């Protein structure tokens, strides 16, 4: 038993530290999504691994209770935007790390055009310039739900928002 105040690790480290192919892939993901370190890649990998493990378990079982669990797992993945509407449990087995990394607040800020680069998006989130439905969120790894996606914007009192509005007015 662990200590109740100490949360368990949210990621698993790779089984072998010096695998060139894995390191190359992790470096590509770190560069593409502007991650701080490989731990963020490992967190996403662990999330995908747990979703796929649960899906394999549920596909192998057939009972009334597992039917509810299937709905819950699919509902969670659809709400978070990792899977599309109408997805089946078999689709969970096809999930990749990039499916999870695309749902991060940092990535969506860049995709919506609020930042020029993913690194700038990360900095804007950390410095408190980004709000989600009016609430300041300073965690770039926050998984944005499907309903919150269009509510991403600048924090109302952000000096960054004022600078961008001034630049747009000057044009």
UniProtKB/Swiss-Prot annotation:
Name the domain of life: Archaea
| Entry-linked PROSITE patterns | RIBOSOMAL_S4, S4
Q: Which Pfam families match?
A: Ribosomal_S4, S4
Keywords on record = Ribonucleoprotein, Ribosomal protein, RNA-binding, rRNA-binding
The family database entries (InterPro entries) matched by this protein are listed as:
Ribosomal_uS4 (IPR022801), Ribosomal_uS4_arc (IPR022802), Ribosomal_uS4_CS (IPR018079), Ribosomal_uS4_euk/arc (IPR005710), Ribosomal_uS4_N (IPR001912), S4_RNA-bd (IPR002942), S4_RNA-bd_sf (IPR036986)
**What GO terms are given for molecular function?**
rRNA binding; structural constituent of ribosome
Q: Name one GO cellular component term.
A: small ribosomal subunit
Which cysteine residues pair off into disulfide bonds? none
The residue ranges of the S4 RNA-binding domain are 103-167
Could you give a single Gene Ontology term from the biological process aspect?
ribosomal small subunit biogenesis
What is the purpose of this protein? One of the primary rRNA binding proteins, it binds directly to 16S rRNA where it nucleates assembly of the body of the 30S subunit. With S5 and S12 plays an important role in translational accuracy.
- Give the record's family classification: Belongs to the universal ribosomal protein uS4 family.
Subunit and partners: Part of the 30S ribosomal subunit. Contacts protein S5. The interaction surface between S4 and S5 is involved in control of translational fidelity.
Q: What is this protein called?
A: Small ribosomal subunit protein uS4
Organism listed in the record: Methanothermobacter thermautotrophicus (strain ATCC 29096 / DSM 1053 / JCM 10044 / NBRC 100330 / Delta H) (Methanobacterium thermoautotrophicum)
